[in-house]
Amino acid sequence: MDINQTKEAVKKEEGYRLETYKCTEGHLTGGYGHKMLEGETAPTDHAGWLVLFERDFARAVTGADDLLMLCPNIKDTARNIVVEMVYQMGAFGVSKFKGMLKALQDEDYKLSLIHI
């Protein structure tokens, strides 16, 4: 799976909402799972939400790559799973999956799945 397929998978999993809503954690959310930040104005159309999605997705890729710095040979599929996780939980949240990250560093993909 390439990164564009991952991007589309994230969109599908998150779903799309034009109007903001409270997510299960109580945060004001909209578009493709974008958590509204303090002082941020919600877009009024799909194009505006896409801009936020692209920014959020780029941050997820950067966050995943930072977490995977010690995994230079990681398979694309595993990297893309970490990108999806970072999109949903943030890099800090995913950093708590220490067993998974260590298994990825060791290229033990089966063990990494156990730690998710």
Predicted regions, residues:
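Short secondary-structure subsegments characteristic of cysteine-rich extracellular domains
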Residues: 93-111
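Short, functionally critical alpha-helical segments immediately adjacent to catalytic or ligand/cofactor-binding
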Residues: 6-15, 81-86
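Substrate-binding/active-site groove segments that recognize
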Residues: 22-42
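Catalytic glycan-binding domains that act on GlcNAc-containing polysaccharides
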Residues: 17-24, 73
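Conserved small/polar residues in nucleotide/adenosyl-binding loops
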Residues: 114-116
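Alpha-helical segment that forms one wall of the substrate-binding/catalytic cleft
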Residues: 40-71, 76-97
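Extracellular cell-wall/glycan-interacting regions and their flexible linkers
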Residues: 1-8, 62, 66, 110
